[in-house]
Curated annotation (Swiss-Prot):
<dbReference type="GO" id="GO:0001695">
    <property type="term" value="P:histamine catabolic process"/>
</dbReference>
<feature type="binding site">
    <location>
        <position position="142"/>
    </location>
    <ligand>
        <name>S-adenosyl-L-methionine</name>
    </ligand>
</feature>
<dbReference type="GO" id="GO:0007585">
    <property type="term" value="P:respiratory gaseous exchange by respiratory system"/>
</dbReference>
<keyword id="KW-0963">Cytoplasm</keyword>
<keyword id="KW-0808">Transferase</keyword>
<dbReference type="GO" id="GO:0046539">
    <property type="term" value="F:histamine N-methyltransferase activity"/>
</dbReference>
<dbReference type="Pfam" id="PF13489">
    <property type="entry name" value="Methyltransf_23"/>
</dbReference>
<feature type="binding site">
    <location>
        <position position="283"/>
    </location>
    <ligand>
        <name>substrate</name>
    </ligand>
</feature>
<feature type="binding site">
    <location>
        <position position="94"/>
    </location>
    <ligand>
        <name>S-adenosyl-L-methionine</name>
    </ligand>
</feature>
<protein>
    <recommendedName>
        <fullName>Histamine N-methyltransferase</fullName>
        <ecNumber>2.1.1.8</ecNumber>
    </recommendedName>
</protein>
<dbReference type="GO" id="GO:0005737">
    <property type="term" value="C:cytoplasm"/>
</dbReference>
<comment type="subunit">
    <text>Monomer.</text>
</comment>
<dbReference type="GO" id="GO:0005654">
    <property type="term" value="C:nucleoplasm"/>
</dbReference>
<comment type="similarity">
    <text>Belongs to the class I-like SAM-binding methyltransferase superfamily. HNMT family.</text>
</comment>
<comment type="function">
    <text>Inactivates histamine by N-methylation. Plays an important role in degrading histamine and in regulating the airway response to histamine.</text>
</comment>
<keyword id="KW-0991">Intellectual disability</keyword>
<dbReference type="GO" id="GO:0032259">
    <property type="term" value="P:methylation"/>
</dbReference>
């Protein structure tokens, strides 16, 4: 690996920008919306039974777009019931965006929000110092387990916080996605850091099996349009390359042979589909619902 290649996570601004481009060029949020519309109502059907308040814990809530979709489904299921929504999110920038979104969203009168600027492990340490652990009716971790050092311990801890009839929802990339193939073949040639792990739903379900937890897993197809990656000097393509490889300025710093090999592979059927002249990377998501 060329020494000039460095992890995308070493430049927060660049990471946020490449992530934004990813969202703009993928069906990631539309895929999540489809799950929230079609599957979530059945999943949360009993979480608030006989309760005067529903407690929801969002781990890595980001800018809140998906969190508010979840809240609207809970409100529809339990009209008028108070909801306590606590958010654990390490990025001050994302929390600020989340608060802006809440401020301009109507129908949140019965929802109390609290934000904690910390990582899931910092939250875990803080909670364990308390004598009594707070129980939750619904806990969700959306696309965040890649940034956790000890995933089985994290799963075990948050599962222990589930109350009666409670559920935990985890969203990660599927083992059938292009990410799985990309990481297995090229992961060792990308910059290594201890901030991010290559995990898919296959790894996660194995961990859940080892922990003896009961869960269901649903896969929904999502794609990312990476056509711009194959246009030399395209700024958008450059940022999507950075996101795909988790490398800062990949096109400028990667060895030419790696860039060429990866460019060829990304157009192969196991990574992407070609449709109407576009190259659509397989971004299939897994939605894992864990029982209390």
């Amino acid at each position: 690996m060329a020494s000039s290649m460095r992890s995308l996570f070493s430049d927060h601004g660049k990471y946020v920008e490449s992530f934004r481009r990813f969202l703009n060029h993928s069906t990631e949020h539309q895929c999540m919306q489809e799950f929230m519309d079609k599957k979530l109502p059945g999943i949360i059907g009993r979480i608030g039974d006989t309760k005067s308040e529903i407690k929801i814990l969002s781990i890595g809530g980001g800018a809140g777009e998906i969190d508010l979709q979840i809240l609207s489904k809970v409100q529809a299921q339990y009209p008028g019931v108070c909801i306590n929504n606590e958010v654990v999110e390490p990025s001050a920038e994302q929390i600020a965006k989340y608060k802006e979104l809440v401020a301009k969203t109507s129908n949140l009168e019965n929802v109390k929000f609290a934000w904690h600027k910390e990582t899931s492990s910092e939250y875990q340490s803080r909670m364990l110092e308390k004598k009594e652990l707070q129980k939750w009716d619904f806990i969700h971790m959306i696309q965040m387990l890649y940034y956790v050092k000890d995933i089985p311990a994290t799963l075990k801890f948050f599962h222990s916080l589930l109350g009666t009839n409670a559920k935990m929802l985890i969203i990660v990339v599927s083992g059938s996605s292009g990410w799985d193939k990309l990481w297995k073949k090229y992961g060792s040639r990308f910059p290594q850091d201890d901030l991010c792990q290559y995990i898919t739903s296959d790894d996660l379900t194995q961990m859940l099996d080892n922990l003896g937890l009961k869960y269901e897993c649903y896969d929904l197809l999502s794609t990312m349009d990476i056509s711009d990656c194959f246009i030399d000097g395209n700024e958008n393509g450059d940022l999507l390359w950075d996101f795909l490889t988790e490398t800062c300025n990949f096109n400028a710093t990667a060895p030419p042979d790696l860039r060429a090999e990866l460019g060829k592979d990304l157009q192969e059927p196991e990574f992407s589909a070609k449709k109407e002249g576009k190259v659509l990377f397989n971004n299939t998501l897994s939605f894992i619902v864990i029982e209390a």
